[in-house]
């Protein structure tokens, strides 16, 4: 169809159409091409700015994630340290309580042993005195005369000492 139109147009009008077309392009370039390219450039700039902004936001998010991860690790480390310190503190406290209880038990045991020895010594002294008095009484009746208490006590002390030595040498010993 164009070929038929071009064939029918005389040569002079082809030049006119060509000049009109060139003039139309020039007018379009002056009036419409500038604003269109400005709009296209503005849109391209907007897209580039949006891409840059997205990249910056992504980098900022990565930095924030890194900071958050670091803070989380530090918090976990601090929590672990606090738990370890609490465990050590409780173990130390427990050991102190056990040591204090053991020391108290040892003190009570020592005091009980001292009291038992004192009771034993008091009983032996009392028995010695009673035996001495009884012996003096029996001996004075048998002999018919009185032995002085100091001489008799010395005899009894010697006798008891020998009994204690024999008891120490015997296979059955007291438990203290």
UniProtKB/Swiss-Prot annotation:
Membrane topology category: Single-pass membrane protein
Gene Ontology cellular component list: plasma membrane; proton-transporting ATP synthase complex
Basic and acidic residues bias locations: 85-94
Keywords, comma-separated and alphabetical: ATP synthesis, Cell membrane, CF(0), Hydrogen ion transport, Ion transport, Membrane, Transmembrane, Transmembrane helix, Transport
Stored InterPro entries: ATP_synth_b/b'su_bac/chlpt (IPR002146), ATP_synth_F0_bsu_bac (IPR005864), ATP_synthase_B_chain (IPR050059)
Subcellular location: Cell membrane
GO molecular function, one term: proton-transporting ATP synthase activity, rotational mechanism
Residue ranges crossing the lipid bilayer per the database entry: 7-27
Region described as Disordered: spans on this chain: 75-94
Pfam name, any one: ATP-synt_B
Family label: Belongs to the ATPase B chain family.
Subunit structure: F-type ATPases have 2 components, F(1) - the catalytic core - and F(0) - the membrane proton channel. F(1) has five subunits: alpha(3), beta(3), gamma(1), delta(1), epsilon(1). F(0) has three main subunits: a(1), b(2) and c(10-14). The alpha and beta chains form an alternating ring which encloses part of the gamma chain. F(1) is attached to F(0) by a central stalk formed by the gamma and epsilon chains, while a peripheral stalk is formed by the delta and b chains.
Protein's job: F(1)F(0) ATP synthase produces ATP from ADP in the presence of a proton or sodium gradient. F-type ATPases consist of two structural domains, F(1) containing the extramembraneous catalytic core and F(0) containing the membrane proton channel, linked together by a central stalk and a peripheral stalk. During catalysis, ATP synthesis in the catalytic domain of F(1) is coupled via a rotary mechanism of the central stalk subunits to proton translocation. Component of the F(0) channel, it forms part of the peripheral stalk, linking F(1) to F(0).
Family annotation (HAMAP family): ATP_synth_b_bprime
Name used for this protein in its record: ATP synthase subunit b
Name of the gene encoding the protein in the UniProt record: atpF
């Amino acid at each position: 169809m164009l070929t038929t139109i071009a064939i029918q147009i005389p040569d002079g009008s082809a030049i006119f159409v060509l000049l009109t077309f060139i003039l139309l392009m020039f007018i379009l370039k002056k009036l419409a091409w500038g604003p269109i390219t400005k709009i296209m450039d503005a849109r391209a700039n907007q897209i580039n700015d949006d891409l840059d902004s997205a990249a910056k936001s992504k980098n900022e998010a990565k930095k924030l994630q890194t900071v958050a991860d670091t803070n989380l690790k530090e918090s976990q480390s601090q929590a672990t340290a606090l738990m370890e310190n609490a465990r050590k503190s409780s173990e130390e406290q427990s050991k102190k309580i056990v040591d204090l209880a053991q020391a108290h038990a040892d003190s009570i045991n020592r005091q009980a042993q001292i009291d038992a020895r004192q009771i034993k010594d008091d009983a032996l002294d009392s028995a010695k005195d009673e035996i001495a008095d009884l012996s003096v009484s029996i001996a004075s009746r048998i002999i018919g005369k009185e032995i002085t208490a100091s001489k008799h006590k010395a005899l009894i002390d010697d006798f008891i000492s020998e009994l204690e030595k024999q008891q120490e040498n015997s296979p059955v010993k007291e438990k203290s």
